[in-house]
Amino acid sequence: CDDTCKDPSSWETEFPRCGGLHQSPINIVTRKVHVTNNLPPLIFIGYTDIINITVENKGHSAHFALPPSVRLTGGALPGYYRAAQFHFHWGGKGRPGSEHTIDGERFPMELHIVHIKEPYSSLAEAQHDRAGIALLAFLFEETTDNHPHLDTVIAALGLVQNNGSATVIPNFRLSDIIPPASDLHHYYRYVGSMTTPGCEHAVAWTVFHRTLSISSRQLDAIVKQCRFWTGLPMTDIYRPTQPLDDRIVYSTNSGTTPKSVIHLWNSFCLAVLLTSALTQ
Ligand SMILES: *[C@@H]1O[C@H](CO)[C@@H](O)[C@H](O)[C@H]1NC(C)=O
Ligand SMILES: [Zn+2]
């Protein structure tokens, strides 16, 4: 097993970037985000296609592989991105396990959909581009009702309990587990890193304002499905929040964040900053 399995505080001995600046995840302080009109909606391509996906227990997390027909653009991203995989971060029984926190609040679970910029074909190639990877993050909120499509995912996790085991979910649709695109116009954007080694500093992060629902029954089921490579229960799989350093978190204008008046000149400056941050 690689160092992903060790305690996050020891990652940097083998992966120096993990101890560097501009790491992820972060705590988003809504009072301090820069509200901008320059974050248009993302454009989801192939998200409604019916696909067969392979789920594999990677020893530290379970990855759901996505075909390259699932793509992403828009949202002020510099180009088109191809989906690679999605995975979840969770806590333990009764313990929340999201990676990003909002005003210090940790959510029960977080979904990450990883996309690699075209024409790169791997994380290794994309990591040299500051926006080589586009990561979509969805925070889950505990509800009394079940998430209607999450049981497929839970059942699949039950079939990949041990490191290296894999299964296929037939007839899966990504759009079944996330809200419709029309509900995803509002999000936070910042530039950061992968949250596992090597902590590649190449990620344009999108954290949606809209949360996903999960019942306590589903949450309990998820956290007890898998085991780490060590054989211990796979719980609390999230990296602690990292310092913001000199970064700015941008947000689309919506009711859930404080609205601030932005003059035309300010918007122009933000657009320039954002574009340069993403294309450096
Ligand atoms: C999914 O797998 C089934 C069974 O192997 C196959 O019949 C079907 O064509 C596959 N669907 C897609 C979209 O690839
Ligand atoms: Zn992740």
Set out the residue ranges of the language-model regions:
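Alpha-carbonic anhydrase
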Residues: 1-280
